[in-house]
Every structure is written in structure tokens, then in C-alpha cells.
């Protein structure tokens, strides 16, 4: 019984740590997405004013797409961490 209790505490600690890490990843991904969107807006404006090239716009679009993908992956990791945490606390 003592071994099982120690194991549950270790699992709870790991799940709590993972949950905190993934929540931070979501916050960071949100910030990066906002920055990528702002950059895309600025580059698009500059392009329309003749100050930036199409390559600059495409690069900004790619960065925005990557930021969105990273945000989705962060959300997924956070949901998985929450599921693991709930599993551990229900044991």
C-alpha cells in the first residue's frame, strides 16, 4: 500500500508539472501568434505602400501559419496534460 501511495504521489507530481508546463506553452504560443499577426499586418501594409516585397509578405504569412500551428499543438498538449491529471486524481 505504501508503494502504491508513493507511486500515485509521483504520478500526481509529474502530471501537475506537465499541466503547468503546457499552460505556459499555450500562453507563449498565444503571444507568438499575436506578434505574427501584427507582423503580417505591418508587412502587408508596407507591401501595399510599395515598401515591402511579395517575398516579405509570403514570409510573414508563413510565420503566421507556423504560429497558428504551434498554438493548436500547445492547446492539444494542454488538453492531454489535463486528461492525464484528471486520470491521476481519480485513482
Each language-model region and where it sits:
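Amphipathic alpha-helical coiled-coil segments
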Residues: 1-70, 77-88
Amino acid at each position: 500500500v505504501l508503494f502504491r501511495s508513493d507511486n500515485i504521489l509521483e504520478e500526481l507530481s509529474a502530471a501537475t508539472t506537465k499541466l503547468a508546463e503546457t499552460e505556459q506553452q499555450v500562453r507563449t504560443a498565444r503571444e507568438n501568434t499575436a506578434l505574427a499577426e501584427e507582423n503580417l499586418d505591418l508587412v502587408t501594409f508596407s507591401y501595399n505602400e510599395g515598401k515591402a516585397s511579395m517575398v516579405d509578405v509570403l514570409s510573414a504569412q508563413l510565420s503566421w501559419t507556423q504560429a497558428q500551428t504551434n498554438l493548436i499543438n500547445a492547446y492539444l498538449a494542454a488538453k492531454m496534460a489535463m486528461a492525464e491529471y484528471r486520470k491521476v486524481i481519480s485513482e
